[in-house]
């Protein structure tokens, strides 16, 4: 039994902690990984086999990131891992490569060899895509289990006995409970990605039940951008003598990210937003708002102003969420308006700017939001629109980061000249939402049909362009 079996785990069900705990050497406490004398410059130097080195090269991974360089050797030795790294640091590769390499060592690769849990559907699909890309040349099969997708189709996929299962806790538990012939009783690897989010109350029961039915003798990788108290307690409960690899401070942003904020009156926030967008023509931009309704309203308003904007939120069906993401990734639309459903783990290449239209009440969400840009060593820009009611939340963000974010001034005349046109566009957007059944209960039949709205949304004649030359 674990040496510290009397550890209090307030946030976790005590029975689950007991069920999840595995025999742990040295009390199950993590060991800090010793940094290598020289950071390996190739995947081959890390011990990755040639087949996977070739797969990395095909994906454009020329050299390992810092977290990959520090985590992969320990994972290849069969150690449990705690990996802490900033968003965009390459955490997926850090656990996917060792799992695939362990599978390659088997004479007959085992079905249902590894399971990866993700807090969001989009991140689950992204992880699945990376597994398939890395394993494409060696016949790796992967199934993604998330809500919003037909369960019968997923059951058919599970019947084919994939090597890897990636899913959200709720849908995975549905299949463990209801899908005949499916179990994880021979599972060799469990990965908890974005672990701090997985420990939220909305996932707790499903996660508890999953931990109760999988083998205790397994390798467990726990990855997160932040190390919270809950993550620390989970680590003591279900990892065996883990190695801790940390490539970031507890809450931090990358050095290549430039951050600023505007202090704006609440009634003029839309005007400041349009001002910022006009300063960034052609940029790939993610705008974060607080509610699902706000994503739709803001997308319609901006489209009425001739911006190429699309929204994504938790109220959309899975097909439409993926469709919106694909339109953004392919640059069909260069502005993605989203709730915090898009702040975790999504690896969208080329995001230049993150705009916090609504300031998050949870300071840690700010770190995840701005982590959508300045990824993999690239530069990025994050700007926040802070009104008088959000100033306290923004101060809490600065306290968490440990530094003050510089403010940016703007000529009020430039803002005021935008007000009338934006008001017209917003009024038209509100009318469109009302006529289309803007409230959640009325919208079920044609839920979040962005393309239909884009075709039918009326456009004010006054709002043809907001280029600077038009304003003067």
Swiss-Prot record:
Motif (Q motif): 41-69
Superkingdom: Eukaryota
Outcome recorded upon mutating residue 47 to V: In togr1-1; thermosensitive dwarf mutant
Enzyme nomenclature, EC number: 3.6.4.13
Inducers of expression: By high temperature and the circadian clock. Expression peaks at zeitgeber time 9 (ZT9) corresponding to afternoon of a subjective day, the hottest time of daily temperature fluctuation.
UniProt feature, compositional bias: Basic residues: 461-472
Activity regulation, per record: Helicase activity is activated by temperature increase.
Keywords: ATP-binding, Helicase, Hydrolase, Nucleotide-binding, Nucleus, RNA-binding, rRNA processing, Stress response
GO cellular component: cytosol; nucleolus
Annotated binding of ATP, by residue: 85-92
Loss of function: phenotype: Thermosensitive dwarf mutant. Reduced plant height, root length and crown root number at 30, 32.5 and 35 degrees Celsius, whereas they grow similarly to wild-type at 25 degrees Celsius except for a slightly reduced plant height. At tillering stage, plants grown in a hot climate show narrowed leaf blades mainly due to a decrease in vascular bundle and lateral vein numbers, and all internodes are shortened.
Reaction equation(s) it catalyzes: ATP + H2O = ADP + phosphate + H(+)
Enzyme class: hydrolase
Composition-biased stretches (Low complexity): 17-26
All copies of domain Helicase ATP-binding, residue ranges: 72-245
Functional note: Has ATP-dependent RNA helicase activity in vitro. Acts as a thermosensitive RNA chaperone required for normal processing of pre-rRNA intermediates. Required for normal cell division at high temperatures. Required for a primary metabolism adaptation to high temperatures to support thermotolerant growth by regulating gene expression. Partially rescues the yeast rRNA helicase RRP3 mutant which has repressed cell proliferation at 38 degrees Celsius.
Quaternary data: Interacts with U3 small nucleolar RNA (U3 snoRNA) as part of the ribosomal small subunit (SSU) processome.
Annotated PANTHER family: ATP-DEPENDENT RNA HELICASE, ATP-DEPENDENT RNA HELICASE RHLE-RELATED
Free-text comment on this protein's domains from its UniProt entry: The Q motif is unique to and characteristic of the DEAD box family of RNA helicases and controls ATP binding and hydrolysis.
Identification of the protein by name: DEAD-box ATP-dependent RNA helicase 10
Source organism of the structure: Oryza sativa subsp. indica
């Amino acid at each position: 039994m674990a040496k510290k079996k009397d550890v209090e785990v307030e946030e976790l069900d005590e029975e689950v902690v007991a069920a999840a705990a595995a025999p742990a050497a040295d009390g199950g406490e993590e060991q800090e990984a010793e940094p290598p004398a020289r950071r390996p410059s190739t995947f081959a130097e890390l011990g990755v086999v040639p087949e996977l080195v070739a797969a990395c090269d095909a994906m454009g991974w020329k050299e390992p990131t810092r977290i990959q360089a520090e985590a992969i050797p320990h994972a290849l030795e069969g150690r449990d891992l705690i990996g802490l790294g900033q968003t965009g640091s390459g955490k997926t590769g850090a656990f996917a490569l060792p799992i695939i390499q362990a599978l390659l060592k088997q004479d007959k690769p085992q079905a249902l060899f590894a399971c990866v849990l993700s807090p969001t559907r989009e991140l689950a699909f992204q992880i699945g895509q990376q597994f398939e890309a890395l394993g494409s040349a060696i016949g790796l099969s992967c199934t993604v289990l998330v809500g919003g997708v037909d369960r019968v189709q997923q059951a058919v996929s599970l019947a084919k006995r994939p090597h890897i299962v990636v899913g959200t806790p709720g849908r995975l538990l549905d299949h463990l409970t209801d899908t005949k012939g499916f179990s994880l009783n021979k599972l060799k690897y469990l990965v908890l990605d974005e672990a701090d989010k997985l420990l939220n109350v909305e996932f707790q029961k499903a996660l508890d039940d999953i931990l109760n039915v999988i083998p205790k003798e397994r390798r467990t990788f726990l990855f997160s951008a932040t190390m919270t108290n809950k993550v620390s307690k989970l680590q003591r409960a279900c990892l065996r003598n883990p190695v801790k690899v940390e490539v970031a401070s507890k809450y931090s942003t990358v050095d290549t990210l430039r951050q600023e904020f505007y202090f704006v009156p609440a009634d003029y926030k839309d005007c400041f937003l349009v001002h910022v967008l006009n300063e960034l023509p052609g940029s790939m931009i993610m705008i974060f708002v607080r509610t699902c309704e706000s994503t739709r309203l803001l997308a319609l308003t901006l489209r009425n102003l001739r911006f190429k904007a699309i929204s994504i939120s938790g109220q959309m069906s899975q097909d439409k969420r993926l469709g919106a993401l694909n339109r953004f990734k392919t640059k069909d639309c260069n502005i993605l308006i989203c709730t915090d459903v898009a702040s975790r783990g999504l690896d969208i290449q080329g995001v230049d700017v993150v705009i916090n239209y609504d300031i998050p009440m949870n300071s840690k969400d700010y770190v995840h939001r701005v982590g959508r840009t300045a990824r993999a060593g690239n530069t990025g820009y994050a700007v926040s629109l802070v009104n008088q009611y959000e100033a306290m939340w923004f101060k809490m963000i600065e306290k968490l980061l440990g530094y003050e974010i510089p403010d940016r001034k703007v000529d009020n005349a430039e803002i005021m000249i935008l007000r009338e046109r934006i008001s017209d566009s917003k009024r038209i957007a509100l009318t469109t939402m009302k006529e289309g059944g803007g409230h959640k209960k009325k919208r079920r039949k044609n839920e979040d049909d962005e393309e239909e709205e884009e075709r039918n949304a009326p456009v004010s004649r006054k709002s043809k362009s907001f280029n600077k030359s038009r304003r003067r």
